[in-house]
Amino acid sequence: MRAGELNFSSPARANPKRKKQIMPNTIKLHRVLRASPETIYRAFLDADAKVKWLPPNGFTGKVHHLDAKVGGTYKMSFTNFTTGKSHSFGGKYVELVPHERIRYTDKFDDPNLPGELQVTITLKKVSCGTELNIVQEGVPDVIPAEMCYFGWQESLVQLAELVEAEIPD
């Protein structure tokens, strides 16, 4: 897979005869950021930072709680700034390897968005910063994979703006 490619796997998409069965998608993203793994790791686990970069364009975000430890939970909501409609989601931190790996679950409060997503973030120090890989598994078919991918792209632009800024104290 090349950087910036949409990569999703869904047996329902591969075999049109299986359309009636709900099959989750997998979204994979790759990015290199001009920031240290430590800074990026912190941006994923700090409530104030997440509100700054995670909501896609046109949305505001709120962290209701975030307990960044293995077994700890979090709850967030995104609100469409134009319509005022909110959707909330939360999950549990499954694995935290400082500055290298974050694994957590995601589950929407909306019963029309079923299932539990698994998200894996990997960070690798490279010569010009950090290689960031994101794998989001279990995205329900009711969420078009390309829209999920598009939302992540917007969020990662905002993440780059946050972590790549060099502002003197």
Give the label of every model feature segment.
Residues 103-153:
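Beta-strand/loop substructures that line and gate deep hydrophobic ligand-binding cavities in soluble
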